[in-house]
Amino acid sequence: MTPFETFWPETFRHAKQHSPFYREQFRDISDAPRLEELQTVDKTILSARNSDFLSVPRERIAEIVTTSGTTGKPLLWMLTESDVDRLALNEQISFECAGVTPRDTVLVAVSLDRCFIAGLAYWQGLRKLGCTVVRVGASSAMLVLEMIERVRPTVIVGVPSFLRVIADKAAELKFDLKNCPVKKAVCIGEPIRDVKFVLNKSGQAIEAAWGAKVYSTYGVTELANSLCECDAGMGGHLHDQQLHLEILDDAGKPVAPGETGEVVATTFGVEAMPLIRYRTGDCAAMLYEPCRCGRTSPRLGPIIGRKNQKLKLKGTSLFPSTLQAVLEECVGVESFAIVARAENELSDSVEVLYHGDAAVAGLGEAMQARAKILPKIRHASREEIEALQLPSRDGGARKRRTFVDLR
């Protein structure tokens, strides 16, 4: 039997019996049906009926986390003790995929506060793997450098933009980061590869500054699951005993293997808040051929964008990530924001604001060459761009955004 055939019937039974939302959805269905016969759910439904997805008594909840709030109000997400164990096992498998072993000392440069699931997950998974774990957090580049000098970690986990901040601080202090013991950088929360699996500017900068190999990951709070790539760097390996993924087109139909569509997930083994056919809103492709590392599990390719962020511009559809890649590669662009507004039913209005000494004409040529379109481009102050990237400093979104959707 396949993992899906093994775990799907129990997932369906548990959700139907214990989740108010799924009890209502499945009231006319007795046995586990074909998955594609069921309706999908998205974050709008989760937000409107958050508590109706709880499938255990409240006293069994061991942890409460929240989503990042990047695309809306943060959701409350709950885990039982068993769910936390599942989370730890998932991360153990992911770190093993990246070649991390019990002999490694791992610096976790990720927040463990503000109800953030990732820091909790990495700490639990690394402990389960048997590593020495240093929870340094993400508040101070100087502290990270001090701990690198004192504990000599071999692996670091962090958001790519923060790893670059650390590298800049090291250069300022003439700290020899490239020859420090860190040989692996597990990157979370931001892309480091393009759709062709080539390292983007951020990934290249981290490898150059740290002298370490970078590993891309993909995770979603609501799934309490993440995927990590192996040394081949050709997609995150799926843990198919914990998660089933579909890739669907705009009509909700499966795309052909290797084609891009929306990532739709069904969780296995979750007690508190199981999800069935959850539309993540992320767009990517699945690869099914065996990996060069020898694993035969399916792999999820780089996320090319959010489905609801797709832009329509002068008869062309594209994701903001295409423009972001151009801006990241242009010498002289220090920071930027892409602002989308509704123009009419057939087209959006897109304005690119950047700070730095790059020429507007050069940026325009690069965008026409890569994206086949020429949006409005304007030089802006660092403060104006910062205000767009971080609109709220009190609560709300935790991530710096470079795409601002005002449609």
Residue ranges and their predicted role:
Residues 1-66, 71-89, 93-97, 102-103, ...:
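Nucleotide 5′-phosphate-binding alpha/beta core
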Residues 2-13, 129-407:
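Active-site glycine/GP-rich loop and adjacent strand/helix microenvironment
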Residues 67-68, 106, 126, 245:
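Hydrophobic alpha-helical segments that mediate membrane insertion or helix-helix packing
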Residues 72-86, 123-124, 130-132, 153-162:
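Acidic/glycine-enriched edge-of-secondary-structure segments
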Residues 82, 111-112, 138:
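Beta-hairpin (beta-strand-turn-beta-strand) motif
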Residues 85, 112-116, 193-194:
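Short, small-residue-enriched loops and turns at beta-alpha junctions
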Residues 85-92, 119, 141, 145:
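Short, well-ordered alpha-helical scaffold segments within catalytic/effector domains
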Residues 92, 96-125, 129:
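Conserved AMP-binding loop of ANL adenylate-forming enzymes
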